[in-house]
């Protein structure tokens, strides 16, 4: 015959109370995780959709269109980083920043830094330049001007245009952006694409 809770030992009541508390905590934690997961997925889709499809399609027209757009540059750099060959785009970016220097006194130290990082024989991020261009750039270091890296930058741009840019257009780094449905799909493959897509463009927000 059931005597109700009053008939149970005190230890049983404490155990039941503890179990109820734990279940409540787990349910609350589960709800919180589901909310965060949903929120993160929404954020990733928003990031994917932040660039218009018209703009993304223009990136396939030329490398110049791609890297002149902040989000395009971020996506291309992420692709090169995945191939462990980001030194080319890093050099190109450094040259662009160098040409914006207004103070003549800052040209020489910045030029030497770029040269030592990308062009010298023992450069940590040595770019692939022919011997003539390398020697010409080396001579320019004697009296650095705003145009001292122009030839080297042009050669690296052409190299990226003929090689890595073409591979980028065939990669998921670009295809996931040009096809937004792959970013927000609920399928497992779509969810993976969403994560990858979100990692491409956060810095262009």
From Swiss-Prot:
Gene Ontology process terms (BP): negative regulation of signal transduction
Keywords noted in UniProt: Lipoprotein, Palmitate, Phosphoprotein, Signal transduction inhibitor
InterPro entries assigned: RGS, RGS_RGS4, RGS_sf, RGS_subdom1/3, RGS_subdomain_2
Positions of S-palmitoyl cysteine lipidation: 2, 12, 95
MF (Gene Ontology): GTPase activity
UniProt-listed CDD domains: RGS_RGS4
Post-translational events: Palmitoylated on Cys-2 and/or Cys-12.
Domain RGS as annotated: residue spans: 62-178
The keyword Lipoprotein appears for this protein: yes
SMART domains noted in UniProt: RGS
Coiled coil: none
Protein purpose: Inhibits signal transduction by increasing the GTPase activity of G protein alpha subunits thereby driving them into their inactive GDP-bound form. Activity on G(z)-alpha is inhibited by phosphorylation of the G-protein. Activity on G(z)-alpha and G(i)-alpha-1 is inhibited by palmitoylation of the G-protein.
PANTHER family: REGULATOR OF G PROTEIN SIGNALING, REGULATOR OF G-PROTEIN SIGNALING 4
UniProt name for this protein: Regulator of G-protein signaling 4
Lineage: Eukaryota, Metazoa, Chordata, Craniata, Vertebrata
Chain's gene name: RGS4
């Amino acid at each position: 015959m059931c005597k109700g809770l009053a008939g149970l030992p005190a230890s049983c009541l404490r155990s039941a109370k503890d179990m109820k508390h734990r279940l409540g905590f787990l349910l609350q934690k589960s709800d919180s995780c589901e909310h965060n997961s949903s929120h993160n997925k929404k954020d990733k889709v928003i990031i994917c959709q932040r660039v218009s499809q018209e703009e993304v399609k223009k990136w396939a027209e030329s490398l110049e269109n791609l890297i002149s757009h902040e989000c395009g540059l971020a996506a291309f750099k992420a692709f090169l980083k995945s191939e462990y060959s980001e030194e080319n785009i890093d050099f190109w970016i450094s040259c662009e920043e160098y040409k914006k220097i207004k103070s003549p006194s800052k040209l020489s130290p910045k030029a030497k830094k770029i040269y030592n990082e990308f062009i010298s024989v023992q450069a940590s991020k040595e770019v692939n330049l022919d011997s003539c261009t390398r020697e010409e750039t080396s001579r320019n270091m004697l009296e650095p001007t705003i145009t001292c890296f122009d030839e080297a930058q042009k050669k690296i741009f052409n190299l990226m245009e003929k090689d890595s840019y073409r591979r980028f257009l065939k990669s998921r780094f670009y295809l996931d952006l040009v096809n937004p449905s792959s970013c927000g799909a609920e399928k497992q493959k779509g969810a993976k694409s969403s994560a990858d897509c979100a990692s491409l463009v956060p810095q262009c927000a």
